[in-house]
Amino acid sequence: MASMLLAQRLACSFQHSYRLLVPGSRHISQAAAKVDVEFDYDGPLMKTEVPGPRSQELMKQLNIIQNAEAVHFFCNYEESRGNYLVDVDGNRMLDLYSQISSVPIGYSHPALLKLIQQPQNASMFVNRPALGILPPENFVEKLRQSLLSVAPKGMSQLITMACGSCSNENALKTIFMWYRSKERGQRGFSQEELETCMINQAPGCPDYSILSFMGAFHGRTMGCLATTHSKAIHKIDIPSFDWPIAPFPRLKYPLEEFVKENQQEEARCLEEVEDLIVKYRKKKKTVAGIIVEPIQSEGGDNHASDDFFRKLRDIARKHGCAFLVDEVQTGGGCTGKFWAHEHWGLDDPADVMTFSKKMMTGGFFHKEEFRPNAPYRIFNTWLGDPSKNLLLAEVINIIKREDLLNNAAHAGKALLTGLLDLQARYPQFISRVRGRGTFCSFDTPDDSIRNKLILIARNKGVVLGGCGDKSIRFRPTLVFRDHHAHLFLNIFSDILADFK
């Protein structure tokens, strides 16, 4: 079986390389030296349009129970492997979106399947404890093997959560408690504070604020939603807070041609940040913290320079604001470093950092001074899931053993180079190509063309994602290799050549 599979892959690789050399070929990508992911498929295999008939039937059934309009198609996860997602109609697609950037090392990784089959791990998957009061014996050990082994600089404290929204929500609460504790000093809670907090009034509920950026996405819970400014549909009809919103830089591309303009744009945004901090202090809505993504993701894959973030960090420190870096989507290795903020080169990059998605669990790291001063202040029933810490420990081992951070940088370079070639060939469809590692994207002329390209690509066997008003984003797994990039680029080149 193994030898037959290897032969099939070699044949596929030969055919793939051969067609790139055919005179007059409109494919732009060069064949890469193929480094196989052992549990991967050879390529896409399409049997129906997507969604196919089985998916459509299941969508109808689900729509009876809930609004299912967001569902793209139903999946067969038993058959999905590596970089390939298989749907219930038997269509096999190269997945460059990976469950909204949340699959770290591919579908059905053999090491993870082996892990869950080991008898000593069974109880961890069957029994989900309330970690805040009844953690299992090996909880600390597993945290050390998983999350604490990749802790950011200067952050020794860790609280686990279940998802990105609850990670950010509780991180915001932690910041507010830290700030009020600074103001309160050594004294305990006053009777007035204890009474007024119960009726949502000051001084028990101080009127602090969090500064966020236009285009940001930090989650859908109430506090997070007040800092989210990417799509109106996320926020409409929901009461919110009067918190400051700063502009995020809108860089011009190619970067090397617009150095001065981009520096001026970043300076403008930083000046506005400082102005808002002062303005809200005068309004008696003191800015307790600043929250920012290293790359704005849902809002359109908006980048800023490393220098912008270094200066933003300085502003937070100058004004006594906590600095919260949201690594929910950028964390876990996709930019070529485990945490995207590592690219900034700071010894003190943040006070608090949130994570989820590729980390398989949620939570946040923070400095010692942000540690809650009493139990139950940051708390919920589960506080994450220890089975996810078990899986994450193995994921981190694989990332290190297979050098997947360097792979993300290398494969990302292949992808970005190919996208730039496509941009040169089809400037009427592709602009503002940008990326860090495999965390790449480009703009289309409008959302109609963007959505049409995503649908065509899906029916050709490639899953892509949209973001912002008109961008297409790439969020492949960490086992995405150069040859996957070239495979996609050839498929997408065909699509653009025929696009009308």
UniProtKB/Swiss-Prot annotation:
GO biological process, one term: positive regulation of heat generation
Residues modified to N6-succinyllysine: K231, K252, K413
Chain positions found as N6-acetyllysine: K252, K279, K318, K413, K452, K470
Role this protein plays: Catalyzes the conversion of gamma-aminobutyrate and L-beta-aminoisobutyrate to succinate semialdehyde and methylmalonate semialdehyde, respectively. Can also convert delta-aminovalerate and beta-alanine.
Associated disease: GABA-transaminase deficiency: An enzymatic deficiency resulting in psychomotor retardation, hypotonia, hyperreflexia, lethargy, refractory seizures, and EEG abnormalities. GABATD inheritance is autosomal recessive.
Family: Belongs to the class-III pyridoxal-phosphate-dependent aminotransferase family.
The protein, known as: 4-aminobutyrate aminotransferase, mitochondrial
The organism of origin for this protein: Homo sapiens (Human)
